[in-house]
């Protein structure tokens, strides 16, 4: 049993990989003061509720864009499972056939995982890989594995949080799929509608502009990330794979282990 850990700015996603299949997934809010003992206690309870013996773990692969919790995650696996977790970084890109052709020669490990998994799903294709997380990231990758362009914008969670922080009288809302009717006569539902449809329109609009700029290419578009599943039934522009990042982390982990064993 392998633990695949995706540490984002908002949530830590723990996924178990058992007998060749992705099993349970659990989400814990990302918080920089979480200790190893606290993380272990939460995992143990979640695993117990699912009738899983978490101590059957034999390895751990971690992608993290929130460095403040890396120490606690490492300590948890070492202290409670006797496992040294494998952390994925953009330094592994060349090993995986990815060339980072950006002004900054580094990207988040989650983006690398997304790209690796997308290239496996769609080999020999020019790709537009979108991660709809805390920040929405549009990655442009050609069939040779060159990451040559990007667009970054606020994610849905950022937009919801900005309403709370920047207004005094508006209600706090959770964005779920509204009705197909966009217009509402109630404040809360109209705010939910604006956030939901406004965010989706932004994503679809950016995609259309990218496709126009890259008109000479036949881009395969694939999306993942925490917010992506909310839009599965309301857009035909996106091919959504909610496990894309998790699949990529697993692929990179296997490559790193294989490379280490081959030395």
Swiss-Prot record:
Q: Which cofactor does it need?
A: NH4(+); K(+)
Is Kinase one of the keywords? yes
Enzyme Commission number(s) of this protein: 2.7.1.33
Residue sites binding ATP per the record: 6-13, 134
Query: Which positions are tagged coiled coil?
Result: none
Keyword annotations from UniProtKB, A to Z:
ATP-binding, Coenzyme A biosynthesis, Cytoplasm, Kinase, Metal-binding, Nucleotide-binding, Potassium, Transferase
In terms of Gene3D superfamilies, this protein maps to: 3.30.420.40
GO annotation terms (biological process): coenzyme A biosynthetic process
**Xref: InterPro entries:** ATPase_NBD, Type_III_PanK
**Gene Ontology cellular-component annotations:** cytoplasm
Catalytic site positions? 110
Residues binding substrate are: 108-111, 187
Q: Does the keyword ATP-binding feature in the UniProt annotation?
A: yes
Note the Pfam families from the entry: Pan_kinase
GO MF, one annotated term: metal ion binding
Pathway entry:
Cofactor biosynthesis; coenzyme A biosynthesis; CoA from (R)-pantothenate: step 1/5
Q: Which reaction does it catalyse?
A: (R)-pantothenate + ATP = (R)-4'-phosphopantothenate + ADP + H(+)
Instruction: Quote the record's cofactor note.
Output: A monovalent cation. Ammonium or potassium.
- Which SUPFAM superfamilies does the record match to this protein? Actin-like ATPase domain
How does the record describe its quaternary structure?
Homodimer.
Q: Which family does it belong to?
A: Belongs to the type III pantothenate kinase family.
NCBIfam families, per database record: baf, PRK13318.1-6
**Protein name (Swiss-Prot/TrEMBL):** Type III pantothenate kinase
Q: Which organism is it from?
A: Anaplasma phagocytophilum (strain HZ)
Q: Which gene encodes it?
A: coaX
């Amino acid at each position: 049993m392998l633990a695949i850990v995706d540490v984002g700015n908002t949530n830590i996603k723990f996924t178990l990989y058992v007998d060749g299949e992705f099993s349970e997934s659990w989400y814990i809010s990302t918080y920089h003061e979480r200790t190893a003992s606290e993380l272990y206690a939460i995992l143990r309870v979640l695993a117990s509720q699912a009738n899983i013996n978490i101590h059957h773990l034999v390895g751990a692969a971690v992608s993290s864009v929130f460095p403040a919790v890396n120490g606690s995650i490492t300590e948890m696996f070492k202290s409670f499972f006797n496992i040294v977790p494998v952390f994925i970084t953009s330094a592994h890109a060349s090993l995986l056939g990815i060339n980072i052709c950006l002004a900054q020669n580094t990207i988040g490990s989650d983006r690398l995982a997304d790209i690796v998994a997308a290239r496996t799903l769609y080999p020999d294709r020019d790709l537009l890989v979108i991660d709809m997380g805390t920040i929405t990231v549009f990655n442009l990758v050609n069939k040779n594995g060159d990451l040559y362009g990007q667009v970054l914008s606020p994610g849905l969670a950022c937009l919801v949080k900005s309403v709370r922080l920047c207004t005094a009288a508006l209600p706090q809302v959770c964005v779920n799929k509204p009705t197909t009717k966009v217009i509402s006569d109630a404040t809360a539902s109209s705010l939910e509608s604006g956030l939901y449809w406004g965010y989706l329109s932004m994503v679809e609009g950016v995609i259309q502009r990218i496709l126009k700029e890259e008109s000479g290419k036949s881009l395969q578009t694939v999306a993942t990330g925490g917010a992506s599943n909310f839009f599965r039934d309301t857009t035909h522009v996106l091919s959504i794979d909610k496990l894309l990042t998790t699949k990529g982390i697993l692929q990179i982990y296997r490559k790193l282990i294989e490379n280490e064993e081959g030395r």
